[in-house]
């Protein structure tokens, strides 16, 4: 699933092509995504200007003349900017045609993506209303994290992936950030001191920023808006490296299950 870095890479890529452009046509080839795509978009969106493209958590927010188009990439979604003459393929479900003979095409083989319209204050949308702070913002700091987790018995990795505590951190980047912080993914969140929380926050910010700079991670489906894969997977320290030597101490990387997710860690470096 695309996590915050992949969504931010997508946002930055499409912003240069879409911001300030007018929508001329909408094509929907498959309405059956995670929630049905509204057929009203076919008549509602043409003529509207795309003013800005921002990101909240893993949601892309297209602020248009009369409301906001909300897109979530789901498990396997990607957005491409292409000439309108580009033939569609099997998993190309949705297109925004623009006034420059380009289009934004949404591709999603597994169809867990989301395309929604909201004509009110987008901050009040039910999907966005109760989200935690952005991990790269000043609001996410050691004191904040310590306050949020100090009475929780869940593991620190589960806490990092809780979107009500902090948004956008999925399994890959939780594993990597915990390694860089020297904290085991298995320990109880409530056992962390303020100092450890501050160290973890720094590791989260560093990991996400490096991933964005590397174009995100491309393990299966993800590509940026011009079809290029990310390369952050080449920089993983623990994720997916079960049984391989830790790049820091040489001990073998361990793997365990936490809920429905795999956790990767170095038992020597992470306590």
UniProtKB/Swiss-Prot annotation:
The keyword Hydrolase applies. A zinc finger (FPG-type) spans 237-271. This is Formamidopyrimidine-DNA glycosylase. Belongs to the FPG family. It holds the Pfam family Fapy_DNA_glyco. DNA binds at residues 91, 110, 152. Gene3D superfamilies: 1.10.8.50, MutM-like, N-terminal. PANTHER family: FORMAMIDOPYRIMIDINE-DNA GLYCOSYLASE (PTHR22993:SF9). Its EC number is 3.2.2.23, 4.2.99.18. Keywords: DNA damage, DNA repair, DNA-binding, Glycosidase, Hydrolase, Lyase, Metal-binding, Multifunctional enzyme, Zinc, Zinc-finger. It comes from the Bacteria. Monomer. The active site is at residues 2-3, 58, 261. GO terms for biological process: base-excision repair.
């Amino acid at each position: 699933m695309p996590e915050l870095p992949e969504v931010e890479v997508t946002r930055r890529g499409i912003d240069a092509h879409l911001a300030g452009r007018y929508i001329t046509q909408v094509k929907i080839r498959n309405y059956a995504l995670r929630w049905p795509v509204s057929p009203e978009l076919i008549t509602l969106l043409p003529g509207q200007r795309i003013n800005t493209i921002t990101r909240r958590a893993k949601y892309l927010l297209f602020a248009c003349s009369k409301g906001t188009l909300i897109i979530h990439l789901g498990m396997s979604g990607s957005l491409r900017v292409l000439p309108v003459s580009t033939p569609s393929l099997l998993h190309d479900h949705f297109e925004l045609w623009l006034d420059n003979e380009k289009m934004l095409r949404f591709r999603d083989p597994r169809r867990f993506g989301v395309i929604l319209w909201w004509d009110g204050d987008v901050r009040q949308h039910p999907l966005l209303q109760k989200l935690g702070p952005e991990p790269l913002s000043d609001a996410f700091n050691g004191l904040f994290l310590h306050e949020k987790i100090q009475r929780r018995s869940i593991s620190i990795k589960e806490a990092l992936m809780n979107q009500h505590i902090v948004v956008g951190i999925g399994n890959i980047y939780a594993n990597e950030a915990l390694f860089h912080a020297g904290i085991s993914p298995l320990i109880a969140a409530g056992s962390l001191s303020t100092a450890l929380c501050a160290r973890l926050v720094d590791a989260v910010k560093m990991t996400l920023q490096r991933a964005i700079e590397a174009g995100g991670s491309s393990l299966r489906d993800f590509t940026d808006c011009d079809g290029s894969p990310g390369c952050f997977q080449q920089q993983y320290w623990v994720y997916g490296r079960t049984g391989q030597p830790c790049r820091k101490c040489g001990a073998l990387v361990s793997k365990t299950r936490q809920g429905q997710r795999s956790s990767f860690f170095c038992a020597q470096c992470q306590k």
